[in-house]
């Protein structure tokens, strides 16, 4: 843990020196306070047999949309240093794990190794840290900030054409395209915003059937409801 924390502090200190805003005494005091704070934070969350365990807890992160990491906030307060004077990037992530310290600039770049203590790699730690600082501050690894992606790009306009035979000289193309605000807006409907139901189709009223009329051939008095008497036939007989 001692080597990994030392590599982290040296890496951050070299970045602060490149910014040239703090004196040598303030940088050394900040580095000493940061080392003490990291030791106190990692002592119960360091698992050499499983380096991935506790990685999120040991991660040091700087992001535009997040508050200052508690590690930097405490180190700056105890060393009487303004965080903005450190000159650290707007977005940076450092993973302090057993046997390896990695860093990533921006949100889309690939992480790179600051120092590795696996086997013989530990002997080249100072040289590797210096190389990591140069690599991190280069133009390629400066990273794209997440807030830069939110900026609106101005729309490109068609350049003016001096050729009189160009199609862009026609009246149809030279006129500006009307904005959408000139068109009438969609009507607002009542009833919770839904359009009214369409009218029901009109069906003509059907002609009623006529009631059944008894034929004149069966006219006459009725004996009962099943028999009728024909008066003409009874008179002949």
Curated annotation (Swiss-Prot):
Database matches in Gene3D superfamilies: Anti-proliferative protein, N-terminal domain
* Recorded GO CC terms: cytoplasm; nucleus
Signal peptide span:
none
The protein's superkingdom reads Eukaryota
Against PROSITE patterns, the record matches this protein to: BTG_1, BTG_2
The record's listing under Pfam families reads: BTG
What protein family does this chain belong to? Answer: Belongs to the BTG family.
Q: What is this protein called?
A: Maternal B9.10 protein
Protein's organism: Xenopus laevis (African clawed frog)
